[in-house]
Amino acid sequence: MTIMRKSHPLMKMVNHAFIDLPAPSNISSWWNFGSLLGLCLIIQIASGLFLAMHYSSDTTLAFSSVAHICRDVNYGWLIRYIHANGASLFFICLYLHIGRGIYYGSYMYKETWNIGIALLFLTMATAFMGYVLPWGQMSFWGATVITNLLSAIPYVGTSLVEWIWGGFSVDKATLTRFFAFHFILPFIIAATAMVHLLFLHETGSNNPLGIPSNSDKIPFHPYYTFKDLLGMIIILAMFLTFVLFFPDLLGDPDNYSPANPLNTPPHIKPEWYFLFAYAILRSIPNKLGGVIALVLSILVLALFPFLHTANQRSMMFRPISQLLFWTLVSDLMILTWIGGQPVEPPFIIIGQIASILYFSIILIFLPIAGLIENKILKW
């Protein structure tokens, strides 16, 4: 008689994905972020569900309902701060996961990589709409500024913006639909993540050496189940420490003022995890050009499989590419800093140089470095 996990239709799927899955024997802790992203998604859906029970998506009630959650609902303050900071944790794990993929050449699994990019877009859309819901000053003006960018699209832009707003400005209709979309999108993300996993399991995981590991596989359980569990415990400990001691560190003080269409905040800026893209947007003095650069700053990830010129998949033994990779990481940190600064010298020129460097490293320097490293290996 076969054991249940191998015969039961449902258990069989779980077994193939999480128990008997053959995994490379040498994958490092950088491979933990997939499971950590799953944990983040579960935390966000669970905390979001409880927040939605008490939240009201009406312009006159939204701000008060969030205050009510924090003051009157049992542990409402905790649920709210877990949800708000959970988004930051989500993006930290997401960016580290993408960085790992770039460093170790995981983008060569094209289907998995492209679905990952779709997941990134979905997550960014969800986070943006979630930021609008508390209906504070930065919520309102962030929504106004970012949705207004679509008006730069020739011919259909203005109509498109008014269609998204449901009127001639960000108002009740906008808030209601953003709440509806913010509620449904995480479930779409969860479904897309399943497809992401499906394609990953077609090829098997990459490994730090970037070489086929078919000759040396180990079962996912117990080795990587416990490794993932350890990662989850460490991340949860750090996350809860942050939530309980510094809940407002990453938030904007302006969002504690109710939305006021007649009063513009001095510096309109998104949450920290969008600042790098916001800096790229602002570094181009033309509206349409800025919007195109903003979209391309994420879409450029899709070009990685086609720009890979090196004979080796991983950057582990490619020092020139390593140097460029860490320059790219530093450049993204500079862009994040610039995105939070006012539009004045010297920040404007720093942002423009950092934006040019961002695209240059990905589109020009990394492919050239790969070719140089191929030549060096032949000597």
Curated annotation (Swiss-Prot):
InterPro entries: Cyt_b/b6_C (IPR005798), Cyt_b/b6_C_sf (IPR036150), Cyt_b/b6_N (IPR005797), Cytb/b6-like_sf (IPR027387), Cytochrome_b (IPR030689), Cytochrome_b_C_euk/bac (IPR048260), Cytochrome_b_N_euk/bac (IPR048259), Di-haem_cyt_TM (IPR016174). Heme b b562 binds at residues 83, 182. It is found in: Mitochondrion inner membrane. The keyword NAD does not apply. Coiled coil: none annotated. Its cofactor is heme b. The chain crosses the membrane at residues 33-53, 77-98, 113-133, 178-198, 226-246, 288-308, 320-340, 347-367. The keyword Secreted does not apply. One of its GO terms (molecular function) is metal ion binding. GO terms for cellular component: mitochondrial inner membrane; respiratory chain complex III. The cytochrome bc1 complex contains 11 subunits: 3 respiratory subunits (MT-CYB, CYC1 and UQCRFS1), 2 core proteins (UQCRC1 and UQCRC2) and 6 low-molecular weight proteins (UQCRH/QCR6, UQCRB/QCR7, UQCRQ/QCR8, UQCR10/QCR9, UQCR11/QCR10 and a cleavage product of UQCRFS1). This cytochrome bc1 complex then forms a dimer. Heme 1 (or BL or b562) is low-potential and absorbs at about 562 nm, and heme 2 (or BH or b566) is high-potential and absorbs at about 566 nm. This is Cytochrome b.
